[in-house]
Amino acid sequence: MTLYASTADIKAALRITDSVDDALINMAGSAASSLIDGYCGRTFGTVSELRYFAPDNGYLLQVDDLAGTAITVESSTVSDQVFDVTWEAKDYQLEPLNAYADGLDWPYTRLRAIDTRLWPYAWGEATVRIDGVWGWPAI
């Protein structure tokens, strides 16, 4: 879990100079971070990992918060969990376009198949996997 304020940050904001309550301050910071994640329904930290997705249709793939553009996208042509097709960046468009609002970088949440490409749609089966950095680009 990402702490949105370190123990040192909290102590500085409250002008606390001793370390008597560091464990309690850290616990409070951790609880506050968990509450923020739960309330917002997303995690603002980042993790680099491989994730699997089931397209709803051939044109648009909804994904978790994608923190950057350095990704590897692969798909399975026959729904057999063998990801035998590697997509190039020219094959899809990350959305929302211009993922920047109110002075903040926003994560990408969709990949649109472009040109003649279509996402392999197999009635709820995970036919796409993406290796990338997930979460919020910056907090």
Regions from the PLM with identified roles:
Residues 1-139:
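Divalent metal-cofactor coordination and adjacent catalytic microenvironments
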